[in-house]
Design a protein with these regions (language model features):
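Structural preference for solvent-exposed beta-strand-turn elements
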Residues: 1-175
Length: 175
């Protein structure tokens, strides 16, 4: 992993929820989360957009999660409607509160999802939720940037079943 403030913030988030994270001198990251301590990452709000990507994994482990309302970033305002719509189709209920989003799911299942436009964050979030969902999820008009392909390669190496049709911008995930 690269040495950066973004990695440090993400590590802090993972440790907050209960992960044991070790980054070696050769920058290899090893992480285990035997017990999730919390499903809320409110204390780490607005440092980066990673809390949104924690939704799927937290929902699978705890059935509920709470993340902060995320603001913009140096890129500008980035809405989360694509994330919400995709997860809703997979059986997740997301409620907007004053300072947070509260998500709940008891039966996360595969779905046919088509994004209005390719979104890296929404594609990552859908993949991270779909790998442990019941059934098959198809993402049409998915982002296929290198970081998406790297995520898929890592997850497949961990036992996931994800196929990519890069030219067609389609990703199929077998939960």
């Amino acid at each position: 992993v690269p040495l950066s403030a973004e990695i440090d913030i993400t590590r802090e988030l993972c440790e907050h929820i209960g992960s044991d994270v070790v980054i070696s001198d050769t920058r290899v990251c090893r992480m285990q989360t035997p017990h999730v301590r919390t499903s809320s990452v409110m204390e780490l709000s607005r440092k980066n957009r990673i809390p949104m990507l924690a939704l799927g994994p937290l929902l699978h482990r705890r059935g509920f999660a709470e993340i902060p309302v995320l603001g913009g970033c140096p890129i500008g305002h980035r809405p989360i409607n694509l994330h919400v719509e995709a997860l809703n189709k997979m059986g997740v209920r997301i409620e907007r509160r004053e300072h947070s989003y509260y998500a709940q799911a008891h039966d996360i299942h595969g779905a046919d999802i088509e994004f209005e436009y390719p979104s890296v964050g929404a594609t990552e979030n859908t993949i991270l939720t779909a790998v442990r969902a019941r059934g098959v999820t198809r993402i049409a008009n998915a982002a296929t940037e290198p970081e998406i392909i790297n995520l898929i390669t890592m997850l497949n190496g961990m036992g996931a079943h994800i196929a990519v049709k890069e030219q067609a911008r389609e990703i199929n995930i077998e939960g």
